[in-house]
Regions:
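Glycine-rich, low-complexity intrinsically disordered segments
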Residues: 2-197
């Protein structure tokens, strides 16, 4: 009978600062979040909404815990995966005209939400009508993609059309939106910056 012993061993630790001069950090302000298409809007609105996106979080995955008990011990296993929500804020500008090509972030997201639930008719939409895909791309100093997340089956679950309105505040209005999605796949671009280590 094979018996595996529980032992404690220290891993070798090596500290060196030689790489510090070559490493280029990924910056929090170099990113683009864009939908492939936005339901209820024309094709130009995906780029328009990406242009005014101010904040966004990256995908996060959590595994539900499952346990099995034997004798005096508990063993842990990974359960079902669960993806977090994506929360974004968008600058809200006054649209220049009534044309669809000049819609504000609030207009675009309202049109999208009406594909999920239309308050005029009371109808709900099919998922194939209101869900789309999106990409969150993080960039290097030269604008090359160094990391990207493709999210599938994404749609808004909450839209706040104006939080904190005040007669004494002249800051730009922002639209807050929360999105759910089915899954995300991380893509690393093959073309890295020439200065990368």
């Amino acid at each position: 009978m094979l018996i595996l012993e529980k032992t404690e061993k220290f891993m070798a630790i090596k500290l060196s600062d030689s790489k510090s001069f070559k490493l280029e950090p990924i910056r929090k302000n170099r990113w683009v979040f864009q939908f492939s298409a936005i339901p209820g809007n024309d094709n130009n609105q995906a780029e328009a909404l990406a242009f005014v996106c101010k904040t966004c979080n990256a995908p996060e995955i959590t595994f539900e815990g499952q346990t099995a008990n034997r004798m005096n011990e508990t063993f842990n296993y990974a359960g079902l995966p669960k993806w977090n929500d994506i929360t974004c804020t968008f600058y809200d500008y006054i649209r220049n005209s009534s044309a669809n090509s000049e819609l504000s972030a609030g207009d675009i997201l309202y049109n999208w939400s009406c594909m999920i639930y239309n308050p005029l008719t009371g109808q709900m939409g099919y998922k194939t009508q209101y869900a789309t895909s999106a990409t969150l791309a993080q960039l290097d100093p030269a604008g090359n993609v160094v990391r990207a997340w493709n999210m599938f089956g994404i749609f808004p679950t909450r839209v706040n059309y104006g939080n904190g309105l005040s007669a004494t505040d002249s800051e730009i209005c922002e639209i807050e939106a929360t999105f759910k999605y089915d899954l995300a796949i991380k893509i690393t671009d093959a073309k890295t910056a020439t200065e990368s280590a």
